């Protein structure tokens, strides 16, 4: 009887086993054909960040959520490959995708635990999960994972599978793949890892957070020891190597991408262009973008701008703490402060610090290095009054305040970032390539790019476009214009009269067009615009690249009352510099894919080749010659310190000295400088273009043109010289004889018309207006009438 029972049971077991095998076979037959294609593995394209470079190959920007560096499996060191295999899959080179013995152990453990608590995922199974499956803990998912692992093993070599794993696996700290992890945790190339470091990294795949050596050093050390012991058991290392690795003290160094900080505004401009072209793929396809800027030029431009902004801010009162963090609820103040400071940048040698204690005796701060320093009243300097000053509210210096200090060793002083801002744009005049661009004092504190986004009044820097229109309309550099006061009843604010003036209160009477621009005479600019017509001027000035919205349809145009950007102004002046051609500013030169293949290359419009002719080359040349006088004897005399005879330019200052400009150029380079507060307010007596913008330009262009030969613009065909003045040939005997009074081009009524004597007029104007002083351009409130009708209405007002 007992024998029958045993026989029956054995039969039942065999039957059940066969039944189970049958079910598994059916499941495999049903599921296997539905498994996903392996195209994504066979043509692996990891998510690689967008990297932006300067023209000289320096990294200026990296964008992308995943920090990854694709590396071929043969380029990984053997100690790392051994460590990972010892940790994750000892029989990797022996199984067919699934480790049967490992599965058996895991099944027993899960049955004992009453659910899926652990797996026996091989490296191949992990590849299947990472690329295709979720992290759900279920038997169904594990079954699909096993089938997919088998399919992968049938299609790919072991080394290819290992390569996929080594590059795709997430290892914490935004690091994907072991090459990236080596940089992230040890700031090393993967081939420079020691055995101890390799074993530590090999412990991360199991649980990147739990075994993070920076956050959980003790657990990470236990995991490292486990892996080293496995390596010893597998004969991968010797006992001596294991013991030495266990004793090795590891030094963790957070990876900091070596990004040149001077070109961050340019990098952001390039990023925006890539995003517009490729969308989110811009951040995952590993594009390498080479820009047109040179890092040496960028650094000089940045420092030139910062120096002027710092000097202006010197003497200002302390405006208060930069920020505040609540330390009252922190269990570990030092760690809380360290983590916060790690998110901030040192700007212009101004180091961020957090106040730990604040009293009359002094202020204790913690630096990003973790070092604590006490500042006495002398070190606090102008910030001493802010210590626990309740009147300053949240801006006071107290425990938790974020401040800036400068210094080294034991000597630090409190400093603050300037409130005044500015921008610099330098273009290749012939192609529009941006050679340097600075959008503000510091990108990290304010990402707003004043070079491209700040719509500000250009002031007198806009006048050359109107003067160019006048030349196109028939005037010459020696046309006489009356520099006298003008009053327009009812055209000012609140219906009052508009009484524009020259800022120095001086009026020179009849002077030449050349002299008027050299001395930046507001009254002359207004009369010129009245003569040529507002409508004509609007249409003409669009040739320089300005949008209609940037050109006001009123006489205020003559004083630069419209709003535009420094970049647009620089583009406009490039027309004068290159002989009359319209070129487009651009920052991207070439785009490569992750394999180093050229995907796109800028084909710029080049002056004299394929760029459209915006204005008559003779017009551009005459304007260049006139603006050389602005540098020689006019409002930009500071630029003459360079000692170059090929420089020309124009300054600009708006109402109450709220905006200051200088745009200078030679036939090869155009550079515009803008200075002003983000919330417009007066800069005071120091806020003229000639006094605050010109010094920035001089320091930068002195470097940019160092070693280059002096080559003034050559006169184009059709330009003649008479009496020291330059003319278009056909106008030598016509309009150059005339003078412009209040109503247009005609002989002055007070005396017969005569040919102007340029040298005589120039000397007279210089004596009447010297020393030239920058004009502050009054902005009127005028109706939007345009063209000759407007001029005829104004004729009766004089």
Curated annotation (Swiss-Prot):
Region (Transpeptidase) location: 413-699
Residue spans crossing the bilayer: 10-30
Keyword Magnesium: no
Residue numbers on the Cytoplasmic membrane side: 1-9
InterPro entries: Beta-lactam/transpept-like, Glyco_trans_51, Glycosyltr_51/Transpeptidase, Lysozyme-like_dom_sf, NA-bd_OB-fold, PBP_transglycosylase, PCB_OB, PCN-bd_Tpept
Membrane topology: Single-pass type II membrane protein
Active-site residues, as the UniProt record annotates them: 88 (proton donor), 460 (acyl-ester intermediate)
Region span, Transglycosylase: 50-218
Pathway it works in: Cell wall biogenesis; peptidoglycan biosynthesis
Catalysed conversion reaction: [GlcNAc-(1->4)-Mur2Ac(oyl-L-Ala-gamma-D-Glu-L-Lys-D-Ala-D-Ala)](n)-di-trans,octa-cis-undecaprenyl diphosphate + beta-D-GlcNAc-(1->4)-Mur2Ac(oyl-L-Ala-gamma-D-Glu-L-Lys-D-Ala-D-Ala)-di-trans,octa-cis-undecaprenyl diphosphate = [GlcNAc-(1->4)-Mur2Ac(oyl-L-Ala-gamma-D-Glu-L-Lys-D-Ala-D-Ala)](n+1)-di-trans,octa-cis-undecaprenyl diphosphate + di-trans,octa-cis-undecaprenyl diphosphate + H(+); Preferential cleavage: (Ac)2-L-Lys-D-Ala-|-D-Ala. Also transpeptidation of peptidyl-alanyl moieties that are N-acyl substituents of D-alanine
Region (Disordered): 734-798
EC number: 2.4.99.28, 3.4.16.4
Compartment(s): Cell inner membrane
Main location: membrane
Name of a matching Pfam family: Transgly
Assigned keywords, A-Z: Antibiotic resistance, Carboxypeptidase, Cell inner membrane, Cell membrane, Cell shape, Cell wall biogenesis/degradation, Glycosyltransferase, Hydrolase, Membrane, Multifunctional enzyme, Peptidoglycan synthesis, Protease, Signal-anchor, Transferase, Transmembrane, Transmembrane helix
All ranges on the Periplasmic side of the membrane: 31-798
Family to which this protein belongs: In the N-terminal section; belongs to the glycosyltransferase 51 family. In the C-terminal section; belongs to the transpeptidase family.
Primary role: Cell wall formation. Synthesis of cross-linked peptidoglycan from the lipid intermediates. The enzyme has a penicillin-insensitive transglycosylase N-terminal domain (formation of linear glycan strands) and a penicillin-sensitive transpeptidase C-terminal domain (cross-linking of the peptide subunits).
Protein name: Penicillin-binding protein 1A
Organism expressing this protein natively: Neisseria flavescens
